[in-house]
């Protein structure tokens, strides 16, 4: 009932011991297995080979005589105490390195065996054996042996394939034992089980996404770049594929070294042996010529063999390291500043671990194994779910479900592999059911992999892990504040969890992989159902009700998280519901379906009021809290975060209470709130959100000394703001009734954002606003009575929004990057000095209906929107100076500027032409793609004359001259004249695109799509395009054209091109708009030999006289023959003019001073 293997030199009686239970198995599967093994000359022992009358105890000695034990777990296995005694003996032999155990799960789930659950567990608990010690020993064996790599036999598994697989693995072990003389085998960490044997066949697992990972890892180990010894750590979350990667590297790099060693499963081996035994494993592999090598000491294990070891460079891979001590045991104590005494320079050492902190100071670099991308994840999943390799794809329905499983796994290789195997040969119904189950909890085996890492955590780290799962994707500072307020040691616990890749921080937020999150929820669910003293976090409505009904211990409840969107029936809370929850730290009633939590239909009732004696609570969130104030017995002494949105609250509590650690208060849209006196002692309050509190008139008796963010948006009765907290960074006064800012507003030395949008009675801005040296964003949109804005000569102001104001002149704003002056009926002109605003990149002039002239604009400007400037007639010449550029996109929009004079239109097209050429010369700075690098539009009905190809209608077809796509082609300029019908009064957006097709040498068409223009209506206001408009865009030479360059660079052939322009909107689709005319220009880089160091010339050669089809090919052939004839003539220096080529007039660029100032601060609104 267990098995072992031996070399050919072992006693001939048997090599394999089979441990099993049940006569049905003996007569069926086991008899077939014995036959298959013996057919391959493998000696087998099962109990029916024993001599009649022989004591059963002597059977245990057969285990010692074996080299392989096959433990066959079936549903009836635990009915036999004898099977369990054998299993305990097998475990003992394996731990001593005398036996290899291969578990076989015969029509029983491995997790059922490991967890001793279901009928399997019931039979074990019903055993007559009363010896508690023995039962404990057997249970350990039941958990331990199934943790080894094994084989699963399903109901539908082909028996012949399974038998072949078992025989193959047995022969593999026997061969290894024969070569090595002895085999030391220890328990296999479940996290290593990504290499578990297939349950349906013996084909070797395929790896997907490994090539890129391997390449990136090899770069850190480069033998040429790094001459000395190099130690690299490979880190990542459990099951992410570290073992797969380092084993692939080991296999690939073995040939680069004469000595190499892979020590895997170090976590398991160090758990079962003393650390001092680990160096022997390494020494045996690096010096195989030594017979039974001896170690010197724990501190210097390789001292005696140092000379031999230093003769050769070595490759050493240490996999599944869990502690720093394991590294010291294998490599000796060292640091990067001192050389290894026994390792020759040029060696390479790779250490794979879940815990990056164990590598601190021991590695030169680390490689973080990330999740698989969707493509590789899908391939890995399909390979195991369907057993195909791209040749015979599965049915469409399964393909769709495959995407959902891959999305669930989020690129986690182990999850993809296990899920694929579980779903192999299952029907559609099973797949759909499995997906529903996974939404509640992870698949069992994946949970067990994570459990290994979780079990190694300290108690504080476990609490932190489970708490963080409740607040994942929240701000790091917020999560740390909550946890540290409960336990000061939580800061270190959070750091440890990050080092072990159980959590991550990204963009200032704490993140947790979905699989880890579901694992944490599963742990909480188990704690709730199993009872005991474990602290619990309740997520399910019924669990919360059970606390009320005293069927669950209230004292152990650590958190309540109730999603009100899932509460479908009216639920009443007893007055004393929270009375005994003395350890409750988090109480959160929220709505996951509405991010603003405004649509909730509250079904939680408190008919008799509420007692809330929660002294330990750190976080109190209660959406639509129904009472006028928090109960008198509520003690906020430890409260960190208070959130009561859309509540009925009128004041927080009666009187004043100590709130020494309160940092965040959110009472948004509590329309009855009129007093905040309860916050007079909140000296650490950092953020206060009172948006929509329409009954609030002032902030009297509120401690604002530490406040950083204050939100009073849409507090329509709020009229005065006398208090100026000096630490304030963001102040939202939009929609209030404030008529002026206090004179001491200049004291806000740290203010970054000030929002006063729609303050309809605000008339002036005090001059002291210029003293706000840190202010980066000022919003005055919709302040219709505001007529003047003070000069700001020295400021960090980056964004100024003055749309909807009555300002008549623009102030001096040297540092502004984004200026919005739209919807201003009083602005007649812009100051001539605007071209000196050296950092301005975005200027919004929409609907400035009195504006008549646009002066020269700064060369840094990337975006100009003058839509609806109905009085605009002229623009400066030049519209803006052209300067050397970096990778940016430029848009100049003059839609609905119906009074633009012809000279203004010509200057806009001239600027577009010059900009296209400049972008052409700088094309090396741009990524290849189909996005327009420059676009403009204006009222008109003609294609500009510099477009060499022009056609009436939306379709342009031409033959392009030979070598048109040579190396100097950098991009294409496109033009479309579009007519808009009068019926488009409700137009909200539209886009103009061009489908460009080129006929390749094989006569196939190579298409690509180019954007030409796009327009979007502002807000929900009605709008329309009033006349025909010209759209121009420049697109960098697409990848498909670059490919033509490479293939046909030396061929003198004509090309055919077809361009079709279309206009689509959000409501109409294609067909309502009409493209009247269209055009194309090919834009080439300048010949650098023509340019001097002082000026840049912009030559745009464009073939314009391409023949229409009715002229045939004769004139084109004549052109080629003439060109060939000219090439044979002696070259003379002369200026030629050909009818079929037009050179766009050369424009000399005047020197423009470079902008030295760099934008360093980023403002988020």
From Swiss-Prot:
Alphabetic keyword roster: ATP-binding, Hydrolase, Leucine-rich repeat, NAD, Nucleotide-binding, Nucleus, Plant defense, Repeat
SMART domains from the UniProt entry: TIR
Entry-linked Pfam families: C-JID, LRR_13, LRR_3, NB-ARC, TIR, WHD_ROQ1
GO biological process: defense response to bacterium; innate immune response-activating signaling pathway
Sequence ranges assigned to domain TIR in this UniProt record: 12-174
LRR repeats (start-end): 592-613, 614-635, 636-659, 684-703, 704-725, 726-748, 772-794, 795-818, 819-836, 837-863
Active site residues according to the UniProt entry: 86
Catalytic activity: NAD(+) + H2O = ADP-D-ribose + nicotinamide + H(+)
GO molecular function: ADP binding; ATP binding; NAD+ nucleosidase activity, cyclic ADP-ribose generating
InterPro entries tied to this protein: Apaf_helical, C-JID, Disease_R_plants, Leu-rich_rpt_3, LRR_dom_sf, NB-ARC, P-loop_NTPase, TIR_dom
PROSITE patterns: TIR
Domain NB-ARC residue range list: 211-474
Primary subcellular site in the record, as a coarse category: nucleus
Signal peptide: none
Family: Belongs to the disease resistance TIR-NB-LRR family.
Subunit annotation: Interacts with RRS1B. RPS4B-RRS1B heterodimer interacts with the bacterial effectors AvrRps4 and PopP2.
Domain observations: The TIR domain is a signaling domain involved in cell death induction. It is involved in heterodimerization of RPS4B with RRS1B, but other domains also contribute to the interaction. The TIR domain mediates NAD(+) hydrolase (NADase) activity. Self-association of TIR domains is required for NADase activity.
Xref: PANTHER family: DISEASE RESISTANCE PROTEIN RPS4-RELATED, LEUCINE-RICH REPEAT-CONTAINING PROTEIN
Protein name per its UniProtKB record: Disease resistance protein RPS4B
């Amino acid at each position: 009932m267990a098995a072992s293997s031996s070399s050919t030199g072992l006693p001939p009686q048997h090599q394999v011991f089979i441990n099993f239970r049940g006569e049905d198995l003996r007569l069926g599967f086991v008899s077939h297995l014995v036959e298959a093994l013996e057919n391959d000359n493998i000696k087998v022992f099962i109990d029916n080979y024993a001599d009649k009358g022989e004591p059963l105890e002597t059977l245990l000695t057969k285990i010692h005589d074996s080299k392989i034990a096959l433990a066959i777990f079936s549903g009836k296995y635990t009915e036999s105490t004898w099977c369990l005694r054998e299993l305990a003996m097998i475990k003992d032999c394996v731990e001593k390195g005398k036996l290899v155990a291969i578990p076989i799960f015969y029509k029983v789930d491995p997790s059922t065996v490991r967890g001793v659950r279901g009928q399997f567990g019931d039979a074990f608990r019903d055993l007559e054996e009363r010896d508690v010690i023995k039962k404990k020993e057997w249970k350990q064996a039941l958990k331990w042996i199934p943790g080894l790599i094994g084989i699963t036999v399903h109901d539908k598994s082909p028996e012949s394939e399974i038998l072949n697989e078992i025989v193959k693995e047995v022969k593999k072990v026997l061969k290894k034992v024969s070569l090595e003389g002895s085999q030391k085998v220890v328990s296999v960490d479940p996290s290593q089980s990504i290499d578990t044997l297939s349950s349906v066949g013996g084909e070797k697992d395929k790896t997907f996404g490994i090539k890129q990972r391997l390449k990136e890892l090899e770069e850190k180990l480069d033998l040429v770049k790094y001459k000395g010894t190099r130690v690299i750590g490979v880190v990542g979350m459990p099951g992410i594929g570290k073992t797969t990667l380092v084993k692939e590297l080991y296999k690939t790099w073995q040939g680069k070294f004469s000595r190499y060693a892979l020590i895997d499963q170090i976590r398991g081996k160090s758990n079962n042996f003393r650390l001092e035994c680990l160096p022997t494993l390494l020494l045996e592999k690096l010096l195989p010529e030594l017979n039974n090598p001896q170690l010197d000491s724990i501190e210097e294990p390789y001292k005696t063999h140092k000379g031999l070891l230093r003769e050769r460079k070595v490759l050493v891979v240490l996999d599944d390291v869990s502690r720093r001590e394991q590294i010291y045991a294998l490599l000796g104590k060292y640091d990067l500043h001192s050389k290894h005494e026994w390792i020759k320079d040029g060696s390479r050492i790779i250490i794979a671990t879940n815990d990056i902190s164990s590598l601190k100071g021991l590695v030169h670099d680390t490689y973080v194994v990330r999740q698989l991308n969707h493509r590789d994840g899908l391939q890995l999943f399909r390979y195991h779910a369907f057993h195909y390799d791209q040749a015979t794809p599965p049915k469409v329905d399964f393909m769709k479900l495959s995407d959902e499983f891959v999305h669930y796994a989020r690129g986690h290789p182990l999850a993809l592999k296990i899920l694929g195997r579980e779903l192999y040969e299952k029907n559609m119904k099973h797949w759909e059911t499995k997906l529903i189950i996974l939404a509640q909890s992870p698949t069992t085996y994946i949970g067990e992999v994570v459990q290994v890492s979780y079990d190694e955590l300290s108690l504080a780290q476990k609490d932190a892990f489970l708490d963080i799962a409740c607040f994942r994707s929240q701000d790091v500072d917020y999560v740390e504040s909550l946890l540290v307020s409960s336990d000061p040691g939580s800061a270190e616990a959070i750091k440890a969890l990050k080092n072990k890749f159980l959590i991550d921080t990204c963009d200032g937020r704490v993140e947790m992989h979905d699989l880890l999150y579901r694992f944490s929820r599963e742990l909480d669910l188990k704690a709730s159902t199993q009872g005991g003293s474990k602290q619990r976090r309740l997520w399910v409505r019924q669990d919360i009700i059970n606390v009320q009904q005293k069927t669950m211990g209230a004292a152990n409840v650590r958190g309540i998280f109730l999603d009100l969107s899932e509460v479908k029936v009216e639920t009443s809370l007893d007055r004393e519901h929270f009375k005994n929850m003395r350890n409750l730290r988090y109480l959160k009633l929220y709505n996951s379906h509405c991010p603003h939590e405004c649509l909730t239909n509250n079904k939680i009732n408190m008919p008799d009021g509420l007692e809330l004696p929660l002294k330990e609570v750190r976080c109190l969130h209660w959406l639509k809290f129904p009472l006028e104030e928090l109960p008198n017995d509520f003690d906020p002494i430890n409260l960190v975060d208070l959130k009561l949105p859309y509540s009925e609250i009128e004041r927080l509590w009666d009187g004043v209470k100590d709130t020494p650690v309160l940092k965040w208060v959110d009472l948004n849209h509590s329309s009855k709130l009129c007093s905040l006196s309860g916050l007079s002692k909140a000296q650490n309050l950092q953020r206060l959100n009172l948006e929509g509190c329409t009954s609030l008139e002032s902030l009297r008796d509120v401690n604002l000394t530490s406040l950083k963010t204050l939100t009073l948006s849409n507090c329509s009765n709020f009229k005065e703001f006398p208090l100026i907290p000096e630490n304030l960074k963001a102040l939202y006064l939009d929609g209030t009734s404030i008529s002026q800012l206090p004179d001491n507003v200049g004291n806000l030395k740290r203010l970054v954002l000030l929002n006063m949008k729609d303050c309809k009675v605000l008339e002036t801005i005090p001059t002291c606003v210029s003293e706000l040296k840190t202010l980066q964003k000022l919003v005055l949109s919709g302040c219709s009575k505001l007529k003047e804005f003070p000069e700001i000569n020295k400021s960090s102001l980056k964004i100024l929004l003055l749309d909807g104001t009555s300002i008549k002149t623009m102030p001096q704003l040297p540092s502004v990057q984004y200026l919005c002056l739209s919807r201003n009926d009083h602005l007649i002109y812009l100051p001539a000095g605007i071209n000196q605003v050296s950092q301005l990149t975005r200027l919004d002039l929409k609907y400035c209906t009195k504006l008549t002239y646009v002066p020269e604009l700064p060369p840094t400007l990337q975006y100009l929107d003058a839509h609806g400037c109905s009085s605009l007639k002229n623009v400066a010449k030049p519209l803006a100076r052209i300067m050397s550029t970096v990778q940016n996109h430029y848009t100049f929009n003059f839609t609905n500027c119906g009074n633009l004079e012809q000279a203004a239109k010509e200057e806009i097209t001239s600027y577009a032409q010059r900009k296209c050429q400049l972008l052409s010369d700088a094309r090396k700075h741009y990524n290849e793609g189909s996005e327009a690098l420059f676009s403009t539009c204006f009222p008109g009905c003609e294609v500009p004359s510099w477009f060499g190809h022009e056609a009436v209608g939306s379709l342009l077809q031409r033959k392009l001259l030979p070598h048109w796509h040579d190396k100097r082609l950098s991009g294409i300029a496109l033009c479309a004249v579009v007519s808009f019908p009068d019926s488009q009064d409700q137009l909200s957006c539209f886009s103009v695109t061009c489908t460009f097709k080129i006929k390749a040498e094989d006569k196939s068409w190579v298409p690509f799509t180019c954007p030409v223009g796009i327009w979007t209506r502002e807000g929900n206001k009605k709008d329309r395009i009033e006349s025909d408009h010209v759209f121009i865009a420049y697109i960098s030479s697409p990848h498909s054209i670059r490919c033509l360059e490479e293939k046909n660079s030396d061929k003198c052939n004509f090309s055919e091109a077809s361009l079709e322009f279309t206009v689509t909107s959000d409501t109409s689709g294609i067909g309502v708009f009409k493209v009247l005319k269209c055009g194309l220009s090919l834009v080439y880089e300048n010949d650098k030999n023509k340019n001097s160091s002082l000026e840049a010339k912009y030559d745009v050669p464009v073939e314009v006289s391409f023949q229409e089809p009715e002229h045939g090919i004769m004139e084109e052939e004549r052109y080629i023959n003439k060109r060939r004839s000219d090439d044979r003539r002696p070259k003379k220096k002369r200026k030629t003019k050909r009818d079929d080529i037009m050179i766009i007039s050369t424009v000399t660029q005047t020197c423009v001073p470079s902008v030295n100032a760099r934008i360093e601060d980023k403002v988020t609104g």
